[in-house]
Amino acid sequence: MNTLLIIDGLNLVRRIHAAQPDENDINNVQQMTLLACTKMLKTHQPSHVIVVWDGDEESWRKKLYSDYKKGRKPMPEALKIALVGIRNTLSEAGIHSLEAESEADDVIATLATKMVENSGAAIIVSTDKGFSQLVKKNIQIWDHFKQLFLDISAHEKKLAVEQYQFLDFIALAGDSGNKIPGIAGIGPKSAADLLNKFRTLANIYNSLDNLGAKQAQKLAEGREMARISYKLGQLQCHMPLEINLKQFRVKK
């Protein structure tokens, strides 16, 4: 079975950079990134590897909701300039890159989905818990910094909902890390309680008459924001990609 190792480029590099004693020591970031990717290849032994990078275009999520990811700390200018060199270093080692038009997330989700649809497997390297919605047979999430696969059961326990409810949970409670709003006045505990009782967002909205007046009002008034939040959190798994996987085969 072919296995594609998909590395979330900026997620990896920015965390490596943040851990450096001297943030201007870009050469060390470059070498640490290469070492990290080499270690992943040794650990997972994939047939193919690809590093996906965010592009410069405004994402469709930002167009849908202007506050999406608002307030994120911008990438240090020195690191931004060094990305080309980092990509070249990886390419020289046989680890090739793909740049998304905007966010890398949907491209990563599409690559993983296509691998499974073609009887392969995918390992996504990222600390972004948004990829948890993709976990199933032959799709795993690897945290390079903890050296662990995402334990979906532990993640379910943390949120107090099941995996199939993750997007409904975001629709209700939002996602503070990405500035996805959710419904005003509905926090993580209330969202989990509602989903444990009614199972789905649709069932919740079909049962407003069975809820307390204040909570029902919050849900009714926040219905459109719930719809937007769900869409913001949902990864697009069938983006049009014009690539040939052969160019990303690991050279033995």
From Swiss-Prot:
UniProt-recorded Gene Ontology molecular function terms: 5'-3' exonuclease activity; 5'-flap endonuclease activity; DNA binding; magnesium ion binding; potassium ion binding
Residues that coordinate or bind Mg(2+): D105
Nuclease is among the record's keywords: yes
UniProt keyword list: DNA-binding, Endonuclease, Hydrolase, Magnesium, Metal-binding, Nuclease, Potassium
Binding residue positions for K(+): L172, A173, P181, I183, I186
Bridged cysteine pairs (disulfide): none
Source superkingdom: Bacteria
Family: Belongs to the Xni family.
PANTHER family: 5'-3' EXONUCLEASE FAMILY PROTEIN, FLAP ENDONUCLEASE XNI
Protein name: Flap endonuclease Xni
Organism encoding this protein: Shewanella denitrificans (strain OS217 / ATCC BAA-1090 / DSM 15013)
